[in-house]
Amino acid sequence: LLGIGIGAPSVNEQNQATAHAANLNWNSGLDIINELHEIFSVPVKLTNDANLWVLAHQQFDQTLLSDFFVVTLGTGVGAGICCNGSLLKGREGFAGELGHVIAQNSGRSCSCGRKGCLETYVSANGLIRTVQSLIAQCNNYTGPLLDLSVCNLSAKMIAELAISGDEIATKAFNLTGQILGKALANMVALFNPEIISYSKETVIMEECCLSLPEQFAEIKR
């Protein structure tokens, strides 16, 4: 073993430790580097997981793109940004915290302490919250989602129901795609990328992307 590289959310590049990760049960910064170094006695490096996707593109993608960004979507939302061939980290390494840009003023409460963050709408948990909201608004819905508790709901399950034509699941994905499309269009305006890439950590992105071309076209108009 020559070394260990770790991708994690909410990484402070200055002190090489995780800060408060809103979607993980960590009450304070976790000193992963020293803990692993004591066990394995090899160099340990830590960076944001979305940044590693950028580095992977640069290492293995033969197209040699110099301007692009990668979107990670799971329990949270993140972005790794490459500008002029260089990974954009920011002062402390928190550049690309796409999930915590505001998608809706005074919107849903986020685990980071703010309201209306993008990931409260387009992450896996955000999709589930949208389904719950739609069911509460629809008095005549009689589909299978009525019989499922929050604990038993998953993004994959909602996607399967949307594919089968379930009214609530389909509407939830459409709404999620609209919000995600606007956020990505804003990223395009800011960074002028050659491509947008995404990690397939969850079924959400693949399903939402079906509606993204329409959202981009609407924004351009």
Regions found by a protein language model. Name each.
Residues 42, 46-50, 103-139:
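Glycine-rich phosphate-binding loop plus the immediately following alpha-helix
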Residues 8, 73, 124-125, 200-201:
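Short secondary-structure boundary segments
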Residues 119-195:
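A mobile "lid/hinge" subdomain adjacent to the ATP/sugar-phosphate binding pocket shared
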Residues 117-118, 202-204:
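Short histidine/acidic/glycine/proline-rich micro-motifs that form metal-
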Residues 62-122:
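Glycine-rich phosphate-binding loop of actin/hexokinase-like ATP-binding domains
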Residues 2-4, 10-69, 206-219:
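Glycine-rich phosphate-binding loop and adjoining helix at the ATP-binding site
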